[in-house]
């Protein structure tokens, strides 16, 4: 079945059929749907090799920068792209992949209430911006509702978390597998009472995938060694007695967390890391090489987001998707001196009250 066969069947030109099957905006939506439906019923399948060669040909005929993309800072901090401990890693990956593919980025802070959707759309069209990558959403999983028309007008992908209202395609680390693998690794090293220390708001942001992965890993432990997650980081930061009471009562032999400050809390109680208790990071960073833990590879999530949005551009896809897509990045364990490896008969720490 060829394009000409479909054209003969439907009474359109071959060029119209080709544009409709590529979802071109030049063809009315009703006509596109009619042609796409008929092509599917007739058994048409595009030749993958020819499609790739044509894409390469079109690419080679364009200038060095095919088009611009917008990198949208969704964080409350307008300087988060440089000042935040995590967000710059996503940004680095976004820029690296965009440059590899011949695109460049313009950056915008979308929490500026003076910047309306209408104004942004006007700017993006003036600058020939074709797609949007959202970075830095940390305080919740909802984007500003005042920008709804923006998400309807462009290809858009979110990094770091999955959003709701609107629900958009996203790329991020696999939070469930990240925590599960960390627990499994600690058990392999001989730890028997791992504990998870987080803030409830962070666990909620990722729809409980941190605690779910942790609890899944605990299945391998004896019932009496399954310590419930401690999700009161913010409260404990304000009142250290909360953490002290919990850790004395729970008696973990290793702590998993996102916060380096928890290591300080432990040492202030008179515990030695790793001699008395192990310490592992769920987001290991280059500036803290002394901590063992999981490398999230958030730069790769940034790269994946760029790949996804460029795919949307090539396929003429825009707006809030009916079926949002996800790319999950695998995390890897890196050992360091905060964990005893291999663990040899080290009891849970017993600090003085």
Could you say what each language-model-derived stretch is?
Residues 245-353:
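Flexible loop/turn connectors
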Residues 182-221, 319-340:
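An alpha-beta-alpha
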Residues 98-111, 166, 194-197, 208-240, ...:
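Short beta-strand elements in bilobed, periplasmic/extracellular small-molecule ligand-binding domains
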Residues 135-178, 279-292:
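Flexible loop/hinge segments that line or gate small-molecule binding clefts
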Residues 4, 42-121, 130, 200:
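Amphipathic helical "hinge" segments at domain boundaries
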Residues 1-58, 353:
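N-terminal helix-turn-helix DNA-binding module of bacterial transcription factors
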Residues 70-71, 128-137, 157, 195-198, ...:
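Periplasmic-binding protein-like
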Residues 169-196, 237-244, 296-317:
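Hydrophobic alpha-helical segments within soluble ligand-binding/sensing domains
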């Amino acid at each position: 079945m060829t394009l000409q066969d479909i054209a003969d069947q439907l009474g359109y030109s071959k060029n119209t059929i080709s544009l409709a099957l590529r979802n071109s905006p030049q063809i009315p939506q009703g006509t596109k749907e009619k042609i796409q439906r008929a092509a599917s019923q007739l058994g048409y399948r595009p030749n993958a090799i020819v499609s790739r060669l044509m894409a390469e040909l079109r690419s080679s005929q364009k200038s060095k920068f095919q088009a611009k993309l917008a990198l949208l800072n969704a964080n409350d901090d307008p300087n988060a792209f440089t000042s935040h401990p995590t967000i710059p890693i996503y940004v680095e990956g976004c820029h690296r992949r965009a440059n590899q593919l011949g695109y460049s980025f313009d950056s915008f802070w979308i929490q500026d209430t003076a910047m309306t959707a209408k104004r942004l759309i006007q700017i993006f069209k003036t600058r020939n911006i074709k797609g949007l990558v959202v970075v830095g959403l940390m305080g919740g999983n909802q984007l500003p509702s005042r920008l709804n028309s923006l998400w309807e007008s462009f290809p858009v992908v979110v990094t770091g978390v999955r959003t709701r209202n609107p629900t958009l395609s996203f790329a991020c680390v696999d939070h469930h597998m990240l925590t599960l693998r960390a627990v499994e690794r600690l058990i392999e090293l001989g730890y028997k009472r791992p504990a998870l220390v987080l803030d409830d708001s962070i666990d909620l942001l990722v729809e409980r995938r941190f605690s779910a992965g942790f609890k899944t890993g605990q299945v391998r432990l004896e019932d009496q060694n399954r310590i419930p997650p401690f999700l009161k980081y913010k409260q404990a930061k304000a009142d250290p007695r909360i953490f002290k009471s919990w850790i004395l009562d729970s008696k973990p032999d290793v702590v998993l967390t996102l916060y380096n400050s928890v290591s300080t809390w432990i040492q202030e109680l008179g515990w030695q890391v790793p001699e008395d208790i192990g310490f592992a990071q769920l987001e290991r960073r280059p500036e803290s090489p002394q901590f063992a833990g999981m490398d999230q590879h958030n730069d790769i999530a940034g790269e994946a987001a760029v790949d996804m949005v460029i795919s949307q551009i090539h396929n003429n896809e825009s707006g809030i998707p009916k079926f949002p897509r996800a790319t999950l990045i695998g995390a890897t364990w890196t050992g360091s001196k905060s964990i005893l490896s291999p663990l040899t008969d080290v009891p849970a720490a017993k600090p003085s009250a």
